[in-house]
Amino acid sequence: MCGIAGTYRWPDGKAVTDRLTETLAHRGPDGSGTYAHSLGDGEVHLGHRRLAILDLSGTGAQPMVSEGLALTYNGELYNAPELRAELEGAGVRFRGTSDTEVLLEAWRRWGTDCLPRLRGMFAFAVFDERSGELVLVRDQLGIKPLFLLRRGEGLVFASELKALAAVTGGSLEVDPAALVASLLYYWVPDSRCAFRGAEKLPPGTWLRCRPDGSVQRGRFWDLREVAAEGQERARSGDAPDLAAVVEESTRLHLLSDVPVATFLSGGLDSSYLTALAARDRPGIPAYTIGFRAEDARFEAMPDDLRYARRVAERFGVDLREIEIAPDVQDLLPRMTYHLDEPVGDPAAINTFLICAAAREAGVKVMLSGMGADELFAGYRKHLANLIAVRYRRVPGPVRRGVAGAVDRLPVATRRRGLRSVRFAKRFLSFAGLPEETAFRRSYTLYDREELIGLLDPDLAPAVDDVLTEHADVYRDNVLDDFVNRMCLADARMFLPGLNLAYTDRSSMAASTEVRVPYVDVEVVRAAFAVPGARKIAGRQGKAVLKEAATTVLPREIVYRPKGLFSAPLRAWMSRDLAPLVREVVHDGLLVRSGFLRREALARMVAEDAAGQRDFSKHLWHVLTLEHWYRDATSRAGHDSPTSTA
């Protein structure tokens, strides 16, 4: 895992690339390098910051240059040994043992045809000195980030958006439509970028820059096609051996020349991976977190720690427990900086603190259970939407009576949150809606009217544009399986837009690599070859994964109630962050600029304080958005995000 950057026919390219690379130092503290080459009346520059994981010697240093090709690469190839053997059989001679050299030689031999063969996580740029072409590539599922900015015939790229912002002299303007999307989702979708002009290279695609100024784009992997192929496979009765696929992926993800550990929450996904990893690495360290007792009680959070201890004891894992009682006022601006775009998921803080503790103990690589919920229908929203289909058949008067009764219930008392009431209110907010709208409403923060009421009225068209985009993505498939339609939408939007994005940025802020064995091309293929009826069986989500896990884990772990990799937001918002909430609501920059309406925010605060509704997540995201916007506009020298022109 590393940081990559570069310029192509960009003014003052060397200085810009040096600054880009310097901004990414946290992603690669083990080394740095640059490359330069003339290109007609311009130049190409590549930069790299190295976090050494495989082949710790100098032969793995980057940018790697060999016989007319120059490569700067961020990621890991888990099938590098197989590709190396094939290339050696074709006469290629390698200098070292890094996967970087394997990628370079695979590109030399096969060009873009090598891309579908890569199994791993990656973002890279390769320059051909003979043709003068630069190609940017991002992995199939969007695990690794790659941001770029084009101006005229020039291009600049980097692993993080903050690097582009740092070298453009404050000329990047905030995109108000992206902030609208952020408010809806509490993250910026992968199809959008918080700054106008900048973009994220889409997963499974490449972009080629030519010396004549032309740009060509291509796709080498399409999740929609994979899902459609999986549906046909399921119809034919070709059921995947899911236990074998997950076991193989976990084994491959352990490939490393430095210490590896796991996240262990005590839930199914992390417990399964940890148990499998412990087979190959006896005594492997695992990190788990807990919160201050009073915070956990206030939030009505489940006791995950006892399950993590049980797994560790059973499989001989070195469990390292971290109690999180963070100074959230201090962490909030720090995390906002590292996350690049406004992200309202407090799990990013958990990830950072765990990775920081692991790094301090000498661990560079962590395995995470990220992705299992999206691919195997493990979130509450998946089951809730399935139940909603049946709920919509209930007579209208009965539904209205139930909704009225639940609406009168409080979501919290002074001492304790009432999770069951929160869940019931959430369910009733979308249960009567059409399929796509219900699915969107089941995991986003606002409905259309609420969001428009929160924003500057001029941004209403942006709201409709964001909602239309969600509908288009959700419906863009040929699947006739409702559960797999939800899983596909999550894998295309929720996974790269939120979970993979914050995992990358939070872990790299602590100079730590996080690997995600469930977000593996072979696991994904297997996941979409499983019918929805085997993913949600009765009231059990992830049923097929649980079935596979019983070959390794005890049933009390497999079938325990679902935990939460989250944070005690209600406790933080009502105590630690209450003064900051008041400041942002009454005199924040977003309010003063007109982007957010003061009276709408004040109403949310009042209803939350009264226990009438739970707006803790909404207000947390307003805080993250405020901090992000202050930083963004201070660089740009203006403070109005409401223009959509």
Model-derived regions: residue spans:
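Adenosyl-5′-phosphate
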Residues: 1-4, 113, 166, 171, ...
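Cysteine-centered catalytic environments shared across enzyme families
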Residues: 1-333, 337-339, 351, 355, ...
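A structural signal for short hydrophobic/aromatic patches embedded in well-ordered alpha helices
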Residues: 20, 182, 402, 524-527, ...
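A structural signal for short, well-ordered beta-strand segments and their strand-loop junctions
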Residues: 126, 135-136, 156, 208, ...
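Active-site adenylate/phosphate-handling loop in enzymes that bind or generate adenylated species
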Residues: 140, 295, 353-414, 499-523
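Conserved S/T- and glycine-rich ATP-binding loop of Class I adenylate-forming
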Residues: 264, 369, 495
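Alpha-helix capping and helix-loop boundary segments enriched in small/acidic/polar residues
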Residues: 299, 342-345, 393
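Short low-complexity, flexible loop/linker segments enriched in glycine and/or proline
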Residues: 334-338, 360, 381-384, 572-574
